[in-house]
């Protein structure tokens, strides 16, 4: 495992957005300017924009707020939350420790080296720019009871963001949040467990907060950040509130399933009563979205007939001209 101590100290010094000379940084960290430059490159590899201005030194384009475990844990009533600077993926971190976790245990990271989205896709995860959060839950009723879970997670995330001031956030079937018709957040639910056995579930969420650019090869749809929409939220408050609300929602979901959430989905549905297309492999199916049914399937109207659609291979997009 690479030692990230120095780059992490460096980012903490640069986090205020001011200029810092290589000399100053070298003195503080007890190393040469050349060594500082090498660690600056690590930060760039993590997706951090570090400017270099001759005669002034290094600076970030704007201050960044780093995650603070003490602040996050101080807003929660117990349960374990790992706050990690650099990790392969928050979901993988929990999956690797599944035997020792309790329902509601969570993990948050500044940077994911191998973040992943639905269908094994890469999830673009620059350092300190977004929120990457995963939570473990053990569903005693088994894997079949998890149907509709990603919808519940989406509703909770949208409601939390709205409470904190991002009041135009909406949900998109089956596992995204949208703002201004662009993707703001994604959800990945990973499940292990056999039929007749409890399901071990790891829920991952990534929220775009302030990233400035993306790798086009990784992001295949229009995206937006809270910052671009003029919304600046405290990352630590957001993380704590999400963990608290997700724990409560998962308890309710365990007892009552999707039923209590159906009307909440309808209020937040980004595409309800709008022309959409479903993409399944290389096939496109056009119709009007009519919300979801009791199982969480997407209801699509074609020629006056409404049919439910369900499945991990379906993508939903707008079909408005």
From Swiss-Prot:
<dbReference type="GO" id="GO:0003677">
    <property type="term" value="F:DNA binding"/>
</dbReference>
<keyword id="KW-0804">Transcription</keyword>
<dbReference type="InterPro" id="IPR008988">
    <property type="entry name" value="Transcriptional_repressor_C"/>
</dbReference>
<dbReference type="InterPro" id="IPR004143">
    <property type="entry name" value="BPL_LPL_catalytic"/>
</dbReference>
<feature type="DNA-binding region" description="H-T-H motif">
    <location>
        <begin position="22"/>
        <end position="41"/>
    </location>
</feature>
<keyword id="KW-0805">Transcription regulation</keyword>
<dbReference type="GO" id="GO:0009102">
    <property type="term" value="P:biotin biosynthetic process"/>
</dbReference>
<dbReference type="GO" id="GO:0006355">
    <property type="term" value="P:regulation of DNA-templated transcription"/>
</dbReference>
<dbReference type="Pfam" id="PF02237">
    <property type="entry name" value="BPL_C"/>
</dbReference>
<dbReference type="GO" id="GO:0042803">
    <property type="term" value="F:protein homodimerization activity"/>
</dbReference>
<dbReference type="InterPro" id="IPR036388">
    <property type="entry name" value="WH-like_DNA-bd_sf"/>
</dbReference>
<feature type="binding site">
    <location>
        <position position="112"/>
    </location>
    <ligand>
        <name>biotin</name>
    </ligand>
</feature>
<dbReference type="InterPro" id="IPR030855">
    <property type="entry name" value="Bifunct_BirA"/>
</dbReference>
<dbReference type="GO" id="GO:0003676">
    <property type="term" value="F:nucleic acid binding"/>
</dbReference>
<dbReference type="GO" id="GO:0000976">
    <property type="term" value="F:transcription cis-regulatory region binding"/>
</dbReference>
<dbReference type="InterPro" id="IPR004408">
    <property type="entry name" value="Biotin_CoA_COase_ligase"/>
</dbReference>
<dbReference type="GO" id="GO:0004077">
    <property type="term" value="F:biotin--[biotin carboxyl-carrier protein] ligase activity"/>
</dbReference>
<dbReference type="GO" id="GO:0006768">
    <property type="term" value="P:biotin metabolic process"/>
</dbReference>
<dbReference type="InterPro" id="IPR003142">
    <property type="entry name" value="BPL_C"/>
</dbReference>
<keyword id="KW-0436">Ligase</keyword>
<dbReference type="InterPro" id="IPR004409">
    <property type="entry name" value="Biotin_operon_repress_HTH"/>
</dbReference>
<comment type="function">
    <text>Acts both as a biotin--[acetyl-CoA-carboxylase] ligase and a biotin-operon repressor. In the presence of ATP, BirA activates biotin to form the BirA-biotinyl-5'-adenylate (BirA-bio-5'-AMP or holoBirA) complex. HoloBirA can either transfer the biotinyl moiety to the biotin carboxyl carrier protein (BCCP) subunit of acetyl-CoA carboxylase, or bind to the biotin operator site and inhibit transcription of the operon.</text>
</comment>
<dbReference type="GO" id="GO:0017053">
    <property type="term" value="C:transcription repressor complex"/>
</dbReference>
<dbReference type="InterPro" id="IPR036390">
    <property type="entry name" value="WH_DNA-bd_sf"/>
</dbReference>
<keyword id="KW-0238">DNA-binding</keyword>
<dbReference type="Pfam" id="PF03099">
    <property type="entry name" value="BPL_LplA_LipB"/>
</dbReference>
<protein>
    <recommendedName>
        <fullName>Bifunctional ligase/repressor BirA</fullName>
        <ecNumber>6.3.4.15</ecNumber>
    </recommendedName>
</protein>
<keyword id="KW-0067">ATP-binding</keyword>
<dbReference type="InterPro" id="IPR045864">
    <property type="entry name" value="aa-tRNA-synth_II/BPL/LPL"/>
</dbReference>
<keyword id="KW-0547">Nucleotide-binding</keyword>
<keyword id="KW-0092">Biotin</keyword>
<dbReference type="GO" id="GO:0005524">
    <property type="term" value="F:ATP binding"/>
</dbReference>
<dbReference type="Pfam" id="PF08279">
    <property type="entry name" value="HTH_11"/>
</dbReference>
<feature type="binding site">
    <location>
        <begin position="89"/>
        <end position="91"/>
    </location>
    <ligand>
        <name>biotin</name>
    </ligand>
</feature>
<dbReference type="GO" id="GO:0009374">
    <property type="term" value="F:biotin binding"/>
</dbReference>
<dbReference type="InterPro" id="IPR013196">
    <property type="entry name" value="HTH_11"/>
</dbReference>
<feature type="domain" description="BPL/LPL catalytic">
    <location>
        <begin position="67"/>
        <end position="254"/>
    </location>
</feature>
<dbReference type="GO" id="GO:0036211">
    <property type="term" value="P:protein modification process"/>
</dbReference>
<feature type="binding site">
    <location>
        <begin position="116"/>
        <end position="118"/>
    </location>
    <ligand>
        <name>biotin</name>
    </ligand>
</feature>
<keyword id="KW-0678">Repressor</keyword>
<dbReference type="GO" id="GO:0005737">
    <property type="term" value="C:cytoplasm"/>
</dbReference>
<feature type="binding site">
    <location>
        <position position="183"/>
    </location>
    <ligand>
        <name>biotin</name>
    </ligand>
</feature>
